[in-house]
Amino acid sequence: MILSHTGIVRGASRDGRKVSGLTVSVDHDKLSQIVDREKQSPGIVDIRVEIVENEPLSVGDEIMRLVVAGDIRDNVIPVLERTLNAVKETVTHKTENFI
């Protein structure tokens, strides 16, 4: 089973303010630690993460792709969720451009 997540620049921030775009910075050491840890989970074959870093992004642009490959959905879904949450909470820092 292969599951993926594609992050897209939204037109509004979580608090509702309008956004014209953003830039993202990445802590590569933390990203490697998360991926290495989650790859050890039962049934997981591979995890790939690509993040557009230090480039101006506009509404609708892709920010990130996350792909988790594994044996069965019961193993893959939680790893995708944990990896995504960890990346968003500890790896990336977004600077939003408000309208």
Model-assigned labels for residue ranges:
Residues 1-64, 69-99:
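N-terminal, polar/charged subdomain of small-to-medium soluble alpha/beta proteins
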